[in-house]
Each structure stands twice: as structure tokens, then as C-alpha cells.
Amino acid sequence: LAISFFACWAVLLGRSALAMALVALAVVIDNVDGWMARRTVGRNLALKHFGAHFDCYADYISKGIFPVLYLLTATDLQVVSIPLALTYLMAIAVRYSYEFVPDRDHIGLSPDYMIAFLCLLQLAAPQLGSAFIPTLMASLAGFAALAVASFPSPKLKGWALVGFCLFLLVLAAVLLAGDQGMNWLTAGL
């Protein structure tokens, strides 16, 4: 939750690369935390229930609110981006409501993939030039639709989850290395 908050703060300060690195790290921590929680023996039902709901709130910040803040700052708060921002927020809220429907498979595409895509998009931003904003807007619209689509989506497990988390960590490292405000990392080299 704290890392997601700092990612939102960084994007509002105009530090998009740092913000993306932080939100990628938040997704990795979310996946590791979930893995650990499922393996914790002897957790009482109340704590399990609380943890699932609290996790969902934290996810909504990193995978719902953060992408919208990224869009709004990238478009300099242009009014044209507001309907898309609201649509995306509603789609992600609906997607997370599926988490609490008993005996139901995971429906729609996980918002984790949106974060990975946004990291890649941030890295490609200089090459995209004026196509960056339309690409970002189309991506958010597409991911919003996929998040609430009626197809079942498998949950990443085992080595697939490890690979995805490692991919996000590499993206975070590349984003940090390219962040203009992070020159102190290489100052002594």
C-alpha cells in the first residue's frame, strides 16, 4: 500500500519513470505477499478475510488509481481524458468485485498485465513521440474492456508467477536506470 502511494505521489510530481518502477515493485510485492499468505498455516478466518479485502484495496490503488493518475498527468489534465479515466476506474472496481464471488474462476484479464504494459510504454515513450498519448489512451480503454470481459483468465502460479515478477523487477531496474532524477545512482561510477 505504501509503495503504491509513493508511486502515485511520484507520478503527480512528474517522475513517471520512478513512478512506474515503484508500481512495478508494488505488483511484485503483492504477488509475493499473496503467495506467502496462502502458505501461512493456522491463520484464523477473520484475518484471512481482512487480508483479502485489504489486499484488494491496495490493488485498486496500484492498478486502478495509479494508471488513471498516469493518464491524467500525461495529458496535462485535459478534459478529454476524464471519461476514459472514469471508465477505467469503474472497470477495475468491477474486476476486483469478482474476487469475492464464491466458486467463480478469475474473470477478465488481471490488471497486473496493465502495469507491465505501462512500464513498457513508459520505456517506449521517447520513440513514440506524439503517438504516446493516443497509445496510452487506447491501451487503457483496451485493458478496461479486457478486465471485465467474460472469459476466464488463469491465475499465474509457480514458475510463471516467478517469471512475471522477475520481468517486472527488470523493468523497474531499467526504468530507474533511465530516470533523470536518479543520476546519484551512477554518479560515482
What is each model feature region?
Residues 35-44, 90-105, 145-155:
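C-terminal ends of transmembrane helices
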Residues 10-13, 72-76, 101, 128, ...:
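Juxtamembrane transmembrane-helix termini
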Residues 3, 33-36, 58, 62, ...:
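Hydrophobic side chains within alpha-helical segments
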Residues 2-53, 88-89, 139:
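Membrane-embedded alpha-helical segments that form the functional core of polytopic membrane enzymes
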Residues 39-97:
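Multi-pass membrane catalytic core of lipid/isoprenoid biosynthesis enzymes
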Residues 5-11, 63-73, 116-124:
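Membrane-interfacial alpha-helical segments at the cytosolic side of multi-pass membrane proteins
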Residues 20-29, 75-88, 130-142:
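Structural signature of hydrophobic alpha-helical transmembrane segments
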Residues 106-189:
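C-terminal membrane-associated helical module and adjoining short loops/tails
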